[in-house]
Structure formats: structure tokens, C-alpha cells
């Protein structure tokens, strides 16, 4: 894969420095279960807008992270070329989630409205805080409350009233002035 349609590609990790002389690389996983990154194959490795498919043939835990060996990488010199490359996969490989659960990528771009009908803006990003996820909502340019951005906790049944996936809308119980 070189520069095909990348709209369905999601980043799940990053390659680190080479490890040893046999072509192993350090792996930094961004998945909820860090070892879960190895459940997906093949990996799409991206650098400077170019993508290449690599097959993981072996992996191990190493210190607080992981190391991996690829079929296409045979020595340290070849491994150096992949240092700091993004590890991605096709979103079609993601498992289906139970009712009421969402991937962050599915929430980005949704409009956010209060239960009273006030348009708060569009989900621009999400943050993980430890206790709960937080929606980063970019407010409309003519927001009546002068807000540029709102941080809204993703707490189902208290703040998040409903997520209408097909309508691309999230209804919240939230004060627009906050």
C-alpha cells in the first residue's frame, strides 16, 4: 500500500528505536489494552505520507513496553528506517462494540446540542483524564456565550443523554455558559 485512500486508516501505535542487531523494533501501543495491538494484522506503517504493510512474526514484552520482529526487517540497519513510524490499521479490522459504546473516531465531527436545543458546537477531539473521557467541543463562531471551546465530560446517563450515531448528534445536559 503506498498512498491509497487513507480515510479508513487509524493510528494505533508508534515504532520506537531498533532493539538489538536482528531487526527488532520497540513498539509504543496506543490501544486500551497495550498488548491488543498485536491482535491486528497486517500493520500499516506510515512515514511522511507513505504507507507500507509489515507482518509481525514475533513480539515480546520488554521492560514497560514491547518489542516486535517483522518478516520484512532482517537487521538493525533495516530497522532504523522504521524508527518513529506510525503503526496503523484499517478501521474495518476493529471489533464491533456493544450497544452504547463508541470509538472516539466515531464521535469526532458530531454536533453537540443541549437537551434544551442549544447548539454547543462540534466534537473536535477527546481527552482521557483517568476518571472519564472528555469531549473537546469547538463552539460555533457566533456562540452567544462567547465560548471558543467547551470541555464536556463523557458521562453517560448524567451528562451525555443520547448519542444519535446516524444523525451525527450528541445530546447533553450541560449549561451552555460553562
Swiss-Prot record:
A GO cellular-component term linked to this record: cytoplasm
Residue stretches making up the PRC barrel domain: 99-178
Keywords per UniProt: Chaperone, Cytoplasm, Ribosome biogenesis, rRNA processing
InterPro entries: PRC_barrel-like_sf, PRC_RimM, RimM, RimM_N, RimM_N_sf, Transl_B-barrel_sf
Pfam families for this protein: PRC_RimM (PF24986), RimM (PF01782)
Biological processes, Gene Ontology terms: ribosomal small subunit biogenesis; rRNA processing
Gene3D superfamilies in UniProt: PRC-barrel domain (2.30.30.240), RimM (2.40.30.60)
Compartments it resides in: Cytoplasm
GO molecular function: ribosome binding
Signal peptide: none
Source species, domain of life: Bacteria
Comment field on protein domains: The PRC barrel domain binds ribosomal protein uS19.
Complex and partners: Binds ribosomal protein uS19.
Family: Belongs to the RimM family.
PANTHER family per the UniProt record, alphabetical: RIBOSOME MATURATION FACTOR RIMM (PTHR33692:SF1)
Entries under HAMAP family matching the protein: Ribosome_mat_RimM (MF_00014)
Protein's UniProt name: Ribosome maturation factor RimM
Organism of derivation: Pseudoalteromonas translucida (strain TAC 125)
Gene symbol of the encoding locus: rimM
